[in-house]
Amino acid sequence: MRIVCTKSNLVKGVSIVSKAVPSKTTMPILECILVDASTDVIKLTANDMELGIETRIEGDILERGIIALNAKIFSEIVRKLPDSDVVIETTSDNQTLITCEKAKFNIAAQSGEDFSYLPVIEKEDYITVSEFTLKEVIRQTIFSIADNDTNKMMTGELFEIEGNILKVVSLDGHRISIRKIELKEKYAQKKVIVPGKTLQEISKIIGGEAEALVDISFTKNHIVFEFDKPVVVSRLIEGEYFKIDQMLSSDYETKVRIHKKELLDCIDRATLLIKEGDKKPIIIDIKDGTMELKIKSQIGSMDETIFITKEGKDLLIGFNPKFLIDALRVIDDEEVDLYFMNAKAPCFIKDENQSYIYLILPVNFNAVA
């Protein structure tokens, strides 16, 4: 194999596929990036058997071939090469010479034939969204997946298609995030659970352009995200997702409309008095026209009052401040509506069209003086 491409193209391609290289594995071939110049295009691929990423890079193929290079060594070499054309050539015993201007690296490689290729997915059952929409949906839900594997289902997100609506749901046992988007066409009903890790890596790849489109296709075991050049294939999480509809009551005893940034800034200031790992709640005292926020810790205490529009009963309720901050940060509206039933029932933050819904469970607290 002998190929030539620019350093910038190579760096970009390696950076994209490296996200699918496992940090730990007992199979050395999975620590590799496959450089495939066996056809008329140069493709780079990485695959940890759960998540696989392939991308095409521009370049010239002088001699066709295929090779698997250790991802860590390859990416570090490529990153530190001069900004010029890079030549990659292999010998019959899988030695690989990487040349750029006067720099020459000769490294051992593995046969590309041993590499685990991405599964071939027939593109039959798929939807199309913009890169911007996909990036936003991930940003507005990913923070509420569980960060450990105690319950595998909670480490993923539900993608549910019904008609022309895509609903994305995440939860961790303390909160639920729901984002709904309208698709341009109607599609067959579908429910799949996508690993959170896959979505986190995709969000790093997406440029977020409103005009660029992504095709998302489904099989029984896999989901595929097809961008302009990169293709991401991920295993799905098996099982039936949590039944959350019964938790999403539209009843409320108290409704508050408030300026989002003002509330977010106030809670953010309050967290200055909380040490990392400290689970001190923020107490919210809702009365006619005002919301008072109070917090007390070993460091000190703080209270602040914000003007609001209120419907219904007065209420005193406590929350983990981080959960409120996480939800408010991803809402783009200037004003938000908060719905409460009582001090032991969840708070709902949602818009009139319910394009987003954030459910946050309250916490027990001792009244802050």
In which residue ranges do the predicted regions lie?
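Structural preference for solvent-exposed beta-strand-turn elements
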Residues: 1-369
